[in-house]
């Protein structure tokens, strides 16, 4: 399978290194913008501003996509969803196995802890510009879905604020070279349950993206998630 790597940043470089070392896939393009590159799959670790051009290129050339970029808005998400009617797409803010298992865990225990206060804390390196992280947003979404979409998000806190039982607090920390830490904390009366995942290397994201690319081979157009990739 020939892979087009969209983006030339740190994650794209790590993905390139992993693919070359693995030897199963062939890199046919490594760029921020595609012109005449041909390939069987696009793996995207770019910037949300570059997504529209990539999506248009994908549809024009009928190339499936693994989209790992975060920070896009609802308008961009709608474009991705529309594109999935033309080509198969895996959309994931975090392709590592551990985080996707964490999503499953918190979605299962949240209904049993309805009376607990829920907080999400995410920590990343000092070069990450978007906050909260796409992974933290995904954690909120799976918890909210499990709680009948009754919850609402509060990003950080400032000033006088009485906590509502229906709110989930979201907090972003930026510093140093942290690859990515995510915690979901359930605060009850006299007990605390914390589910935490720490990433110690970016290679886990590259490995997950490769797994997603292999999953898409032969798939019909549609929007797929890592839950389906790992099933």
Swiss-Prot record:
The keyword Oxidoreductase applies. Pfam families: DapB_C, DapB_N. NAD(+) binds at residues 33, 68-70, 92-95. It is found in: Cytoplasm. It catalyses: (S)-2,3,4,5-tetrahydrodipicolinate + NAD(+) + H2O = (2S,4S)-4-hydroxy-2,3,4,5-tetrahydrodipicolinate + NADH + H(+); (S)-2,3,4,5-tetrahydrodipicolinate + NADP(+) + H2O = (2S,4S)-4-hydroxy-2,3,4,5-tetrahydrodipicolinate + NADPH + H(+). InterPro entries: DapB_C, DapB_N, DapB_N_CS, DHDPR_bac, NAD(P)-bd_dom_sf. GO terms for cellular component: cytosol. It is an enzyme of class 1 (oxidoreductase). Its main location: cytoplasm. Pathway: Amino-acid biosynthesis; L-lysine biosynthesis via DAP pathway; (S)-tetrahydrodipicolinate from L-aspartate: step 4/4. (S)-2,3,4,5-tetrahydrodipicolinate binds at residues 125, 134-135. The keyword Amino-acid biosynthesis applies. Keywords: Amino-acid biosynthesis, Cytoplasm, Diaminopimelate biosynthesis, Lysine biosynthesis, NAD, NADP, Oxidoreductase. GO terms for biological process: diaminopimelate biosynthetic process; lysine biosynthetic process via diaminopimelate. GO terms for molecular function: 4-hydroxy-tetrahydrodipicolinate reductase; NAD binding; NADP binding; oxidoreductase activity, acting on CH or CH2 groups, NAD or NADP as acceptor. The active site is at residues 124, 128. Its EC number is 1.17.1.8. Catalyzes the conversion of 4-hydroxy-tetrahydrodipicolinate (HTPA) to tetrahydrodipicolinate. Belongs to the DapB family. PANTHER family: 4-HYDROXY-TETRAHYDRODIPICOLINATE REDUCTASE (PTHR20836:SF7), DIHYDRODIPICOLINATE REDUCTASE (PTHR20836). This is 4-hydroxy-tetrahydrodipicolinate reductase. It comes from Brachyspira hyodysenteriae (strain ATCC 49526 / WA1). The gene is dapB.
